[in-house]
Swiss-Prot record:
Keywords annotated in UniProt: Hydroxylation, Thioether bond, Toxin
Stored NCBIfam families: amanitin (TIGR04309)
Protein name: Alpha-amanitin proprotein
Free-text description of this protein's post-translational modifications in UniProt: Processed by the macrocyclase-peptidase enzyme POPB to yield a toxic cyclic decapeptide. POPB first removes 10 residues from the N-terminus. Conformational trapping of the remaining peptide forces the enzyme to release this intermediate rather than proceed to macrocyclization. The enzyme rebinds the remaining peptide in a different conformation and catalyzes macrocyclization of the N-terminal 8 residues.
């Protein structure tokens, strides 16, 4: 589930709102650090 969401969110964020895309990038970076 996490991998699927991580794949879709950046596309949605960048396509709809750069600010959201930045937030998603930060979340993905933190997620990778946790892994």
């Amino acid at each position: 589930m996490s991998d699927i969401n991580a794949t879709r969110l950046p596309i949605w964020g960048i396509g709809c709102n750069p600010c959201v895309g930045d937030d998603v990038t930060t979340l993905l970076t933190r997620g990778e650090a946790l892994c």
